[in-house]
A protein has these predicted regions:
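A glycine-rich beta-to-alpha transition motif near the start of alpha/beta enzyme domains, typified by
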Residues: 63-89
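Conserved phosphate/ATP/ADP-binding segment of small-molecule kinases
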Residues: 160-165, 171-241, 248
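Conserved phosphate-binding/catalytic loop of the ribokinase/pfkB sugar-kinase fold
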Residues: 89-94, 102-141, 145-146
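Conserved phosphate-binding/catalytic region of the ribokinase-like
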Residues: 207-325
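Glycine-rich phosphate/adenosyl-contacting loop at the front of the ribokinase-like
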Residues: 1-65, 76, 314-325
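A short acidic, amphipathic alpha-helical/loop segment
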Residues: 150-158, 180-185, 275
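Gly/Ala-rich phosphate-binding loop of Rossmann-like dinucleotide-binding domains
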Residues: 58, 160, 268
């Protein structure tokens, strides 16, 4: 039975300005700003949390089913995902809007001017999981990733109504969501994913204690960047897993999505919480060593060698039994 990944699908358009934005500002004219920058570089990357997680799961051989909304400009991106083992047959295509897009220009001082166009993502709320299940069968897990807020609530409720196990990954949507909505997204999740900041925000907005969160979820996975991962379950001692050392850290964006993919793959393979978290940590490190959230690969031999260096030969053997390639 498949893993269904719901969440955002987007493209990132990143530009570099060979100067300083502040040099373009005119004193006394800040109420009438009209700025234009001649950039010397443009890079386009495939992204979106849902697509990033699906990509990682595809590399790990799980053939995930991606569910989200895109525009008519999605064809090349779709082909890329399909080549990497992702089932895109349940993606909703908008007839009116383009795929969600992040556009960012960075100057020499690392100042940024950015815009986000949600585009077709707003139509994700129209997607029902029942037709997806009718096409691919009942899922082992539904990941409810950051997306159009109405879509996230709808997918979560449908999982409860139909008895599907789901993972809650509210991510950046926690910043604006009210406490009641966060409670709805989290309660009953098999797995809750957050980073440290999101953990604090969740507790603040819901008024729950950490123990009260644990009473409502199967396990709570908190990423802590270079400090590794913390996994908690009600009534058990916390599990801490190190971050696999980076040899050439380049870009942290997408590391969290890659970790989620590795963790979910490990659990779907029947690995222990510890081993699945270690797998997630290793995949995350591979992701942050390249620019672009879907530019990393997992060559079997080198990946297992590195995994073994971090976690031991026995752990590597367990993962090797499932790793494709």
């Amino acid at each position: 039975m498949p893993v269904v990944v719901t969440g955002s699908i987007a493209t990132d358009h990143l530009m570099t300005f060979p100067g300083l934005f502040t040099e373009q500002f005119v004193e006394g004219q800040m109420e009438n700003v009209s700025l234009s920058f001649l950039v010397d570089d443009l890079v386009q990357h495939r992204g979106g949390a849902g697509a990033n997680m699906a990509y990682g799961l595809g590399l790990l051989g799980l053939s995930p089913v991606l569910v989200g909304a895109v525009g008519s400009d999605f064809a090349d991106y779709q082909a890329w995902l399909s080549r990497h083992g992702v089932d895109t047959g349940s993606v909703h295509w908008s007839e009116l809007k383009h795929t969600a897009r992040f556009v960012c220009t960075t100057d020499q001082a690392n100042n940024q001017i950015a815009s986000f166009y949600s585009g077709a993502m707003a139509e994700a709320s129209q997607i029902e999981l029942a037709p997806v299940v009718g096409r691919v069968g009942a899922p082992d897990l539904v990941v409810v990733g950051p997306n159009d807020p109405t879509a996230m609530v709808r997918h979560t409720q449908e999982c409860r109504d139909r008895g599907f196990a789901f993972a809650a990954d509210p991510s950046q949507q926690l910043a604006w969501a009210a406490g009641d909505m966060i409670m709805e997204l989290v309660s009953g999740a098999e797995v809750l994913f957050t980073n440290e900041y999101e953990s604090a925000l969740l507790l603040q907005k819901t008024g729950w204690t950490a123990d009260e969160v644990l009473d409502r979820v199967g396990c709570w996975v908190t990423t802590r960047a270079a400090d590794g991962v913390l996994v908690r379950r009600a009534g058990e001692e916390p599990l801490e897993v190190i971050a696999v050392p980076e040899t050439k850290p380049v870009e942290p964006t997408g590391g969290g999505d890659a970790l989620r993919a590795g963790f979910i793959a490990g659990r779907m393979w029947g690995l222990s919480l510890e081993r699945a978290t270690q797998l997630g940590s290793a995949v995350a490190t591979a992701a942050v060593e390249v620019i672009g959230t879907q530019e990393y690969d997992l060559p079997r031999e080198s990946f297992l060698a590195r995994f073994g260096e971090a976690f031991g030969a026995e752990a590597a053997d367990e993962v090797a039994a499932h790793l494709p390639g």
